[in-house]
């Protein structure tokens, strides 16, 4: 059995975070038909990939910490279904916090 290439998985993580860090209007344009719901999948990517990449030595402790902050923030978002609409994506301040956390994680990844 061949394990997935950690560098390819890191690229996937970066691409996901780049999208998560974009302004709401860009997210809505890029993710037509339920952008908020699609961003939920990005959270799942981060939650699964970050520990794997840390274990593989591909990301450092600071990047892992920032990815953890993004993950914890999204865990709190999951508690409120009202936040998972495109309208909320534009208006709810918790999404702006999400974008900031994604940008910080990208920065820690050297992006």
Can you annotate each of these PLM segments?
Residues 34-35, 58, 69, 111:
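Intrinsically disordered, low-complexity regions
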Residues 100-111:
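Short, charged, intrinsically disordered terminal tails
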Residues 48-101:
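Amphipathic protein-protein interaction modules
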Residues 13, 42, 70-73, 105:
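Generic structural signal of hydrophobic/aromatic residues within well-ordered alpha-helices
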Residues 20, 24-28, 53, 77-84, ...:
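Secondary-structure edge/capping motif, primarily at the C-terminal ends of alpha-helices
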Residues 26, 30-33, 87-90, 94, ...:
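Solvent-exposed, non-transmembrane amphipathic alpha-helical segments
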Residues 1-50:
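Short terminal alpha-helical segments
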């Amino acid at each position: 059995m061949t394990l997935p290439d950690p560098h390819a998985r890191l690229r996937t993580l970066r691409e996901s975070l780049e999208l998560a860090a974009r302004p709401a209007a860009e997210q809505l344009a890029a993710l037509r038909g339920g952008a908020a719901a699609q961003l939920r999948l990005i959270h799942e990517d981060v939650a699964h990939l970050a520990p794997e990449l840390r274990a593989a030595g591909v990301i450092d402790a600071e990047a892992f910490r920032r990815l953890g902050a993004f993950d914890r923030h999204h865990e709190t978002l999951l508690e409120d279904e009202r936040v998972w609409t495109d309208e909320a994506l534009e208006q709810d301040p918790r999404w702006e916090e999400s974008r900031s956390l994604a940008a910080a994680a990208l920065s820690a990844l050297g992006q």
